[in-house]
Amino acid sequence: MKKILFSAIVALFAVSAVSAQDKGNWAVGPRMNLYTNTGDAVVGLGVFGRYSISDTWRIEPSLTALLHSGCSIDLSVDAHYIFHVAPYWSVYPAVGFTANDIGIWAAGLNIGGGFDLKLTSDWDLTAGLKWQPMFDDWRKNPVVISVGAAYRF
């Protein structure tokens, strides 16, 4: 399990991430997640990266440390389809995969969406909501609320 976890972390930082603006742009940033529908709410602090494949498509790998006893991390990779509502505002639906150990290790899907608000030429405020239906029968499917900042370069 440690080798798989280490490989996933290396892949996360090797691939990095996407920006909501133009093809080839990168963005990285901190994020705080709140995992609901887990019995007790679980808070997570982490990092994400974004890479714009085109003006409308980007990928976003993320790594989140879960701050709850008996939990450790959440690894996710999502694809976003960007709708540029205004020069400073964009919204996106998202779909992807996740693996985490809220109670026990399990893998699942990410289904949701979010928005980016351009604060400066390099910084965005980002927020999202996603449902994580897991591929096991034992635990509930978390709903994740996230808030973060993205530095674009």
Listing of model-derived features with the role each one plays in the protein:
Residues 24-26, 41-45, 69-75, 89, ...:
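Residues that define the transmembrane beta-barrel architecture of outer-membrane proteins
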Residues 50-52, 80-84, 116-118, 150-152:
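Structural signature of outer-membrane beta-barrel channels/translocons
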Residues 26, 55-61, 87-91, 117-125:
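Repeated loop/turn-to-beta-strand initiation elements of outer-membrane beta-barrel proteins
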Residues 20-59, 63-65, 97, 146-153:
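Short glycine/proline- and aromatic-enriched beta-strand/turn motifs that initiate or cap beta-hairpins
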Residues 59, 117-153:
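Predominantly the C-terminal beta-signal and adjacent terminal strand-loop region
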Residues 32-38, 63-69, 73, 81-83, ...:
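Transmembrane beta-strands of outer-membrane beta-barrel pores
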Residues 1-25:
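Cleavable N-terminal export/targeting peptides
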